[in-house]
């Protein structure tokens, strides 16, 4: 009965529009009262959940991304991507996808990606003769690439939700090939649509232009290498790398790009504080919810329930992916990671599924929810930027949506895509 109260009250509060963090806390409190447990548990678990030192990396990486965003990196990354792939069919659409790959290494956030890259590319694409729906669709789905490129704070969040025992370096490495695969599949999808709609093809600007723009964008791109190599080599921890990323971002944007002004710095501070506040509130509320899940032995019950349905690990993984896709339609990615990890990770381990691989699958699957109504935060940001209705977007986004689902399925059932690089780097 307690489990029913916990999940039903949470679902009911979400359905009537109560924010996720409040829904988590209220449903947990109602369950505690039903069980006769002291309400002080809520305060204790909130303090424990928000007080983990490993989570310090998240606000610092977000801050570094905000600084780079306002310091001129997005324009340089778009210019580089334009020189590399702008001459392909669907030119600016291809530029949008590759720019998202580059920018994901700076921000690690799908919302930041669609805001920065979509905000720059969608108006340009419409002005250059691309249909508005195509411009919005490619920008929205391209933002999924940013979820897995280091320094993805989603991977750090998953590590924390898994108990903090998973290597951040391995998770960062595991996300790279799936991110590249998603990039390639979305580029191919964009190429097919552009060919069908007969969009114009632009001339290749020449290797000298590629080199010039690479040199201009290189200081920003080196941030990814600095973070990944530093953590991988054991030179510094994830938290230390995040602090170094902030200092590096300030040096690049002030001394090299000379674009960051004091007003931009203030905006970066407030933007990072706003985003961090939301994430930390959800983390704190999820800690209470997660404690109750463990207290009520929900993970063990989930293992038994799935074992009664399927014995094969791939069948179980398929069921989990299907559940995550449904959950992603009405739950944002951060709370989904924090709620689903304690439930499904024990199931994955019981069936011999690697926790690193499962983390990539969880984030990639949850990411599809970001472009799916009714919650779909990336979908709504992209349509707002493109000045197009959600209904109009949904009529034509399905080829990109199916392409993203194909990548989810491929990564889920071919573990080597996510596990090869971490193993090769050891």
Residue ranges and their predicted role:
Residues 1-426:
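Alpha-helical transmembrane segments of multi-pass membrane transport proteins
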């Amino acid at each position: 009965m307690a489990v029913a109260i916990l999940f039903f009250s949470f679902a009911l509060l979400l359905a009537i529009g109560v924010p996720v963090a409040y829904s988590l806390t209220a449903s947990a409190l109602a369950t505690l009262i039903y069980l006769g447990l002291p309400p002080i548990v809520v305060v204790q678990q909130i303090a424990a959940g928000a007080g983990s030192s490993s989570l310090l990396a998240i606000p610092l990486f977000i801050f570094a991304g905000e600084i780079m965003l306002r310091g001129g990196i997005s324009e340089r990354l778009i210019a580089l991507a334009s020189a590399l792939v702008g001459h392909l069919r669907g030119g600016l659409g291809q530029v949008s996808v590759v720019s998202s790959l580059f920018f994901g290494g700076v921000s690690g956030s799908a919302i930041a990606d669609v805001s920065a890259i979509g905000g720059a590319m969608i108006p340009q694409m419409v002005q250059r003769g691309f249909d508005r729906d195509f411009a919005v669709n490619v920008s929205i789905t391209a933002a999924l690439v940013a979820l897995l490129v280091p320094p993805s704070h989603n991977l750090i969040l998953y590590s924390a939700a898994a108990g903090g025992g998973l290597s951040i370096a391995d998770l960062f490495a595991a996300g790279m090939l799936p991110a590249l695969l998603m990039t390639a599949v979305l580029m191919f999808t964009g190429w097919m649509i552009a060919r069908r709609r007969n969009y114009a093809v632009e001339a290749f600007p020449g290797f000298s232009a590629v080199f010039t723009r690479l040199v201009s964008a290189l200081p920003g791109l080196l941030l990814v290498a600095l973070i990944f190599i530093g953590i991988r080599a054991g030179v510094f921890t994830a938290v230390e790398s995040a602090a170094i990323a902030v200092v590096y971002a300030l040096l690049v944007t002030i001394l090299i790009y000379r674009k960051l002004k004091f007003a931009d710095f203030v905006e970066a501070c407030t933007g990072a504080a706003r985003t961090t506040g939301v994430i930390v509130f959800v983390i704190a509320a999820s800690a209470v919810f997660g404690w109750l899940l463990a207290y009520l032995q929900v993970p063990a019950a989930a293992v038994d329930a799935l074992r009664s349905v399927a014995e094969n690990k791939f069948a179980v993984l398929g069921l989990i992916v299907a559940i995550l896709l449904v959950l992603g339609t009405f739950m944002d990615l951060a709370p989904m990671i924090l709620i689903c990890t304690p439930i499904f990770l024990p199931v994955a381990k019981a069936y011999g599924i690697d926790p690193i691989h499962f983390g990539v699958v969880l984030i990639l699957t949850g990411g599809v929810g970001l472009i799916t109504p009714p919650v779909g935060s990336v979908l709504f940001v992209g349509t707002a930027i493109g000045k197009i209705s959600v209904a109009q977007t949904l009529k034509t986004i399905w080829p990109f949506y199916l392409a993203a689902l194909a990548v989810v399925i491929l990564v889920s059932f071919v573990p080597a895509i996510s596990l090869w690089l971490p193993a090769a780097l050891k």
